[in-house]
Amino acid sequence: MFIGYCKINIFLPESLSLKKKRQVILGIKDRMRRRFNIAVAEKPLDKWQIAELSFVCVNYTRRCVEEQISKVEEYLRFQGKFHIIDCEKQVF
């Protein structure tokens, strides 16, 4: 059994408040859960233009886990509401 982990730091240039950030982040989290069936977590909660999203998936084959994590990163790169600052991927 393999576990895939992806941590993505994003910058939200249009977010002028924590409320606006929450709207954008909740939308991202919901879409990612529905589209890719993965677990999503967010931090820090107190900064209004920076977010760190962590994604985790589990599968029996390493190839499937790597593909899923790559699809998540690729999907997020083409969203227009934020910029990806950093991306870290690991498979255990």
What annotation goes with each model-predicted range?
Residues 58-92:
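C-terminal structural segments of small proteins and small subunits
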Residues 27-31, 36, 73-81:
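A common structural junction motif
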Residues 3, 42-61, 90:
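Short, charge-patterned binding micro-sites
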Residues 37-43, 83-87:
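A short linear hydrophobic-aromatic micro-motif
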Residues 4-14, 18:
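Short glycine-/aliphatic-rich beta-strand segments at the starts of folded cytosolic domains
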Residues 10-14, 34, 59:
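Beta-strand elements of well-folded, non-transmembrane domains
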